[in-house]
Amino acid sequence: MAGNKEFGERLRHLREERKRSNPAFSLRKFAQKSGISATFLSKIERGEFDPPKADKIIRMAELLDVDPDELLALADKVDPDLNEIIKEQPKVLSKLLRTVRGMSADKLHELTDWAHRQRNV
């Protein structure tokens, strides 16, 4: 497997950071709580193996108390919920994503706030 060094390094950094104050974040314990083997986790963190499936990444993010989308993006994966939304209207959503590409974070927040208001009208 090709692996994903950036994902592995970020995952290790987050886990090690938490391990300083909580032994539950040792490689073995974290792997067990994430639903994968310690060997697999070790190889992921070293960039030797590809990241696990999205559901495992989401579980890891929950344990690490980070935004799952951050880890999913690093792993080049999409949240299964978002996948379902995209399948509902693929052409419109593809057009929307291409249109907003390159917009500033502030503009994107304005757009999502506007969309949220429209949805609740």
Residue ranges of predicted features:
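A short, Lys/Arg-rich alpha-helix, primarily the initiator
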Residues: M1-P23
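DNA major-groove recognition helix of helix-turn-helix
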Residues: R15, E45, K56, A75
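Short alpha-helical DNA-recognition segment
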Residues: R20-I44, A73
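DNA major-groove recognition helix of helix-turn-helix/homeodomain DNA-binding modules
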Residues: G35, K53-E70
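Interfacial/linker helices and their anchor residues that mediate assembly or domain coupling
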Residues: D76-V121
